[in-house]
Design a protein with these regions (language model features):
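Short secondary-structure boundary segments
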Residues: 32-33, 64-66
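Short, well-ordered, mixed-charge alpha-helical segments that flank or form enzyme active sites
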Residues: 7, 37-40, 69-72, 94-95
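P-loop/Walker A phosphate-binding loop and immediately adjacent motor/lid segment at beta-alpha junctions
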Residues: 15-20, 71-96
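Short amphipathic alpha-helical surface micro-motifs
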Residues: 43-45, 65-69
């Protein structure tokens, strides 16, 4: 399913907190059909009260809807060229 549907965000948050606490050396990835901009727009769906914390627990986010016309088998970790691989800590904290 889509991890950034609000009900899924609320369900995933305790799990991600636990992973961060117990396995801090692990790199946490998430894939979403929503864009980074949609996740940060206060008025946009699927933002909810836990979105910011959930994002802060991620290391890498692959964002954007899969577009069949943009499918490219040469891409790593994404299915279509419109999808981006985002380094979350560097994006949230540019001086990081």
């Amino acid at each position: 399913g889509e991890p950034f549907e609000p009900k899924n965000q609320r369900a995933l948050l305790p799990f991600l907190r636990r992973v961060r606490r117990e396995l801090p050396q692990k790199t946490i990835w998430s894939f979403t059909g929503f864009t980074w901009e949609e996740l940060h727009d206060p008025a946009a769906y699927p933002r909810c009260e836990v979105t910011d914390e959930l994002l802060s627990l991620l290391d890498v986010l692959v964002d954007g809807r899969y577009v069949d016309a943009l499918h490219d088998i040469s891409l790593r970790f994404r299915g279509s060229s419109n999808q981006r691989i985002i380094d979350v800590p560097k994006t949230l904290h540019p001086a990081f």
